[in-house]
């Protein structure tokens, strides 16, 4: 028997079947670095329209986690897809380098500033530590396949950036948004510093819940308001609180002007509380017998005075919109030094903003004899005992509730009035302008707009000062006596900024005021405060984007971070940009959800359900991690587990196998010499290119809309359905058995070439390593990297007016599916071993029959059978099976006639008819020794 294997055009490629990504990717990365791939892309894109995704800086502390990976991969997908869409999209990664977490790490090793090291040496240690953290994180980000200017990232501790942060504050001061005041701010007694809203987390805490009686200073005045002539015992206004320690700072009791308040007689005393809460309060107090003596609106009780239960003064009843009926008594204990609502209402009524608590959380001397020097969280029991002793405690119980805590220490925090510097939301219309700017931004998902609007509408003034060592100095001088800013404050800040640009923030601490103040140095002192780190990152639109040459003065198009950043970076950036420039710093804001495990639980080391990106890359490769990110809907929680990553790896294999099939069958194809013009191609090949064109239209729209999971789904559908289960199956016969240089085969290769050129680009933003690998195996001259080009423009499709248009082939797909069902049943019944052992008769209604007949003898190639006939539906044989999908079709199957050709595996009656090739069929003889078969349709 002759061996005809050498006469076949068998697929051949060096592109490996197995990705082996964990081993192969590092070598590709080394090549990208050696070649300066990022620089090559920038050069190729120079002069194109820009798209700037400004990197929100991660904090330079600790290893990257799965959330970091999601964030950086999403950014990289966007930057790469924008590049392919014809944009110049530079990506400058950044790091947030100042602040308390770094201070705490350095303290743990070296002690607090002033112990073993001077403050200057301590700052140097902080800078060193941050630099090492940046290096560690950078390696992992690069390993993810993220392309960017990793050699020149921006760091908030770069001298120039530090200087520009000071300049940003100067601009805000110049625009009139800064003010100083003693305001209640989130205060961590462990940090001994004010906290930003974004540094506050909420945890459950058990606190005493108490009802306290404030006796009326003038009982007759109260009785007159309620229209009663006598009561049994003293009259008291009842407040409810879960923070007894704040009672020394009480300066008023707030009522709602429109609520009804009742005067309730119980045994031996009369109590004032909201009428709607009387029943619940009486149950709490255990008062079964009570009488409502009268009711009045809260507004009627305004400015009546009540005696503080243990301090030696009276406090007024005042009116506020913050009073609710959700819990308590409808009368709110008001301490302007310990709460933002209390402060606002206190300002309205001219109340003292009392703060009896020191920075360490202990009461200051002179607060109250039994409280002086006591930590506030240990004082609750003392205050409760004091109230009981004074006869003012009506009820006490334990209550578990959500309580604000420091995100670093996980310990409860307090509101504490301290002298701080604030960016005012209202004194120059910052709130109003910010809300206006929000409407001009595209929020993705769109619910982000309502979220940040609500936050801006309700947020307090932004406390930007901190009492820390490692941070950008506020660089202000204030008068020794009046504490007013120096009249040349902005000019002086520029002088400081110039010095910081040369020597870093230490230049401020080393500065002798006389050097820039001259004679004024005797009257003015340096403000020791540093800036909130959210000011550092929030001003990068000015300190980085506005000054980096690659951004060429363009504002950022997009900010992209986790959904917690509405109150973090998105907020601080919006506040600073609007205060500086009157406009938002971004055009689009995209947020992604948090990562959870396969059961939807939050990632936690204690549960043991964390997924390490380093482990995933070392085991499966970065492209699998990237494919998981892209295939997950980032608008909600993003579930990840070993099983979910295994599914991503399965999807990857399907895509890789498709690419390998394309490359293997392009063996020997030169696009310059062998390309077949569209009009001369086999119709099925043109259809396949049209499928790629339709897929590309969908994929490009999905990239444009940042719907990456849609990109992956469409890519998978193309590989699995249109290619894998139809086209690639059909063309194997023609590709392998036709004459190597025939139009029939070159037409097929031309289609595969067009498809591969498009496919590799669709993959590039997501599976970057694999796309780069494929690119190296594609035939023809090309740029060195797929990332420097644009979406493939060589695709085309069938004309709608053609007889064999897309609709025609869609129907053929259905027919083939119905034929496959019959063949599968015959295989199960052992009637045939494979589809080429079968011949089918298609009994079809006239319209469908005409479509099938149009293919002539090539119908069998579409159906992957050795024989195929078309007959009248009405003449269907008894064994013909009715199609469930196509009512006008019945399919009958029989064993194919003739012998199996060992070369093409088709069964045919002309095997051995040519003496020189007595073992093979006539078609194969023609393809080996003759002119070769002609294909027109399939």
From Swiss-Prot:
Keywords: Aminoacyl-tRNA synthetase, ATP-binding, Cytoplasm, Ligase, Metal-binding, Nucleotide-binding, Protein biosynthesis, Zinc. One of its GO terms (molecular function) is isoleucine-tRNA ligase activity. This is Isoleucine--tRNA ligase. It comes from Citrobacter koseri (strain ATCC BAA-895 / CDC 4225-83 / SGSC4696). ATP binds at residue 605. A motif ('KMSKS' region) lies at residues 602-606. Catalyzes the attachment of isoleucine to tRNA(Ile). As IleRS can inadvertently accommodate and process structurally similar amino acids such as valine, to avoid such errors it has two additional distinct tRNA(Ile)-dependent editing activities. One activity is designated as 'pretransfer' editing and involves the hydrolysis of activated Val-AMP. The other activity is designated 'posttransfer' editing and involves deacylation of mischarged Val-tRNA(Ile). It comes from the Bacteria. It catalyses: tRNA(Ile) + L-isoleucine + ATP = L-isoleucyl-tRNA(Ile) + AMP + diphosphate. The lineage of its organism: Bacteria, Pseudomonadati, Pseudomonadota, Gammaproteobacteria, Enterobacterales. Zn(2+) binds at residues 901, 904, 921, 924. One of its GO terms (cellular component) is cytosol. Belongs to the class-I aminoacyl-tRNA synthetase family. IleS type 1 subfamily. NCBIfam families: ileS. GO terms for biological process: isoleucyl-tRNA aminoacylation. A motif ('HIGH' region) lies at residues 58-68. It holds the Pfam family tRNA-synt_1. Monomer.
